[in-house]
Design a protein with these regions (language model features):
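Active-/binding-site microenvironments in catalytic and ligand-binding cores
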Residues: 1-228
Length: 228
């Protein structure tokens, strides 16, 4: 069974607070005067389900177009159940029980349960999201050289919440995961649709195909999983 694990891009959808979302403008429609339908899409690259490459927070880091195909096609994938609530971080201690799994996979998907707020409570999902704390970013980048990326069912690697303590602000979280300090990085796929993946399911293959637009730091990705 194949499943989409990315959300549709929606002009009424989500981005980081204050950042723009996708806009669509219809140019033509099928009529007596025109044989075809067409649209123009204006697409900020950090709205909807998208992949943060190092260049997002590292001046000389790799961009989405610099990453090898291995970052987008995965046959060793795990779904990690790590329940978290609004403005709660994922720490090294949360990941340590999964060390054996993380050592064997190229991509890990973290399901916290925060996705439940996406359709019911925009303020909570957008402004009080969970986050990947610096200790977790360091743990991932320092210990699992085969790990290419981590996907998450919350808005972003960092949280916009004012409850985040000093040292766990959004730039801190991104920098520790994307290689700002050491050059070692794990990419992040933010704002994923993981709610419908059956608990305990084996993910045989996972694809996160990017829009290869020249010059971008990061990109939307269409995420598709084959579930056994």
């Amino acid at each position: 069974m194949f499943m989409f694990l990315s959300h549709p891009l929606d002009p009424e959808g989500y981005a980081w607070p204050g950042e723009p979302v996708v806009k669509t403008t219809q140019c033509t429609d099928v009529s007596d005067d025109c044989p075809f339908c067409s649209f123009v899409s204006e697409l900020p690259n950090h709205c909807g389900t998208h992949m943060d490459a190092p260049r997002h927070f590292v001046k000389d880091g790799l961009s989405i177009n610099d990453l090898s195909i291995d970052y987008f096609c995965n046959t060793e994938v795990a779904l990690l159940e790590i329940p978290k609530g609004p403005a709660e971080g994922i720490y090294k201690e949360d990941l340590e029980p999964f060390a054996d799994i993380l050592s064997k996979v190229s991509f890990a998907l973290i399901r916290t349960g925060m996705e439940k707020y996406r359709e019911t409570d925009q303020n909570t999902y957008q402004n009080e999201g969970s986050y990947i704390a610096p200790s977790a970013g360091d743990y991932l980048t320092e210990n699992f050289p085969n790990l290419k990326g981590v996907g998450m069912d919350f808005l972003a690697i960092g949280s916009a919440s004012s409850k985040c303590p000093e040292g766990e602000l959004p730039p801190d979280c991104h920098r520790h995961m994307l290689g700002y300090y050491t050059g070692k990085f794990v990419t992040g796929v933010e704002d994923m649709h993981l709610a419908d993946v059956p608990k305990g399911a084996k993910i045989k293959r996972f694809f996160n195909a990017p829009l290869l637009i020249k010059g971008l730091d990061s990109s939307q990705v269409v995420c598709i999983a084959e579930i056994e």
